[in-house]
Swiss-Prot record:
Subcellular location: Virion; Host nucleus
The organism's taxonomic lineage, starting at the top: Viruses, Monodnaviria, Shotokuvirae, Cossaviricota, Papovaviricetes
Protein name: Major capsid protein VP1
GO cellular component: host cell nucleus; T=7 icosahedral viral capsid
Gene3D superfamilies associated with the record: Capsid protein VP1,Polyomavirus
Keyword Phosphoprotein appears in the UniProt entry: yes
Region feature (Disordered): 1-21
Family: Belongs to the polyomaviruses coat protein VP1 family.
Length: 362
């Protein structure tokens, strides 16, 4: 029987070349928000990491992330919650570097949000069952945080557009909050008059506003709500989940005026005190957003830019109405060219919507 041939390379054979390393994005610079001021190339990718703190009410300096103790009214007409009982949306604007020095070009560069990695920070803090919570058993630990919970975040190139919906249109909300104006019974279902932009942090109560599904073409939002009295919070921790922000055309939110907007609301449930009172508990949210530069058609012709510049320099006057439903303008006349003197000064001549000359006798 012939000897078995040894596996492996023959003596004197040239060694195999090692495989080329995988290509990954080259890190140009890393730091704080001041890094955004560094000019980069057209193909550069920028990553922004930030976090939003919860706005639950914070009744005192020791209860950051908690609301004021809740109290329910006996009927709809007497409902008047206090300001610090109301969890509100958190929002922020992140300024991005200016990409265009010449706004008269046919094409411009805009920042485009491509992906986001996000998670709720501090979920293990809810394992604390020994700090002032109501006991489940006489000699046991405290009651864990439970009840209705809501987790929401949004990333966009402009402020999130909101739709107002109320549980009780007769509720009287306190000063310092922004709620739907002039509510009616229709406000408890769908009233298209209740529109707003999420343009202020800690001002829009979560119970009054939801993202508007008919708008927000330039934003992406995600949220879950779980209702119930004894529902436990279910949250995940991972740095491997990435949410793609591109639409079906492969385009992500375009950051208008070089501004990126992030919003969040993370209500984990109700904390039950030893006295039996309850408070909302909220946590912060972390964002890691990847942006790239996209070439777009210039939507602002030079005539628009000049007109806008001139209009901004015009002095504004808060005067009586001269346009709209209550306009005090009686008549406008337009003269063009000359004609022979008419014999009837009361004859009305005008051009209709079709551009035809019309004559009307009084």
């Amino acid at each position: 029987m012939a000897p078995t041939k040894r596996k492996g390379e023959c003596p004197g054979a040239a060694p195999k070349k090692p495989k080329e390393p995988v290509q990954v994005p080259k890190l140009l610079i890393k730091g704080g928000v001041e890094v955004l001021e560094v000019k980069t190339g057209v193909d550069a990718i920028t990553e922004v990491e930030c976090f939003l703190n919860p706005e639950m009410g914070d009744p005192d300096e020791n209860l950051r992330g908690f609301s004021l103790k809740l109290s329910a009214e006996n009927d709809f007409s007497s409902d008047s919650p206090e300001r610090k009982m109301l969890p509100c949306y958190s929002t922020a604007r992140i300024p991005l570097p200016n990409l265009n020095e010449d706004l008269t070009c046919g094409n411009l560069l805009m920042w485009e949000a491509v992906t986001v990695q996000t998670e709720v920070i501090g979920i293990t803090s809810m394992l604390n069952l020994h700090a002032g919570s109501q006991k489940v058993h006489e000699h046991g630990g405290g009651k864990p945080i439970q009840g209705s919970n809501f987790h929401f975040f949004a990333v966009g190139g402009e402020p999130l557009e909101m739709q107002g919906v109320l549980m009780n249109y007769r509720s009287k909300y306190p000063d310092g909050t922004i709620t739907p104006k002039n509510p009616t019974a229709q406000s408890q279902v769908m009233n298209t008059d209740h529109k707003a932009y999420l343009d202020k942090n800690n001002a829009y109560p979560v119970e009054c506003w939801v993202p508007d599904p008919s708008r927000n073409e330039n934003a992406r939002y995600f949220g879950t709500f779980t209702g119930g009295e004894n529902v436990p919070p279910v949250l995940h921790v991972t740095n491997t989940a990435t949410t793609v922000l591109l639409d079906e055309q492969g385009v992500g939110p375009l950051c208008k005026a070089d501004s990126l907007y992030v919003s969040a609301a993370d209500i984990c449930g109700l904390f039950t005190n030893s006295s039996g009172t309850q408070q909302w508990r909220g946590l912060a949210r972390y964002f890691k957003i990847r942006l790239r530069k996209r070439s777009v058609k210039n939507p602002y012709p030079i005539s628009f830019l000049l007109s806008d510049l001139i209009n901004r320099r015009t002095q504004r006057v808060d005067g009586q109405p001269m346009y709209g439903m209550e306009s005090q303008v009686e008549e406008v006349r337009v003269f063009d060219g000359t004609e022979r003197l008419p014999g009837d000064p009361d004859m009305i001549r005008y051009i209709d919507k079709q551009g035809q000359l019309q004559t009307k006798m009084l």
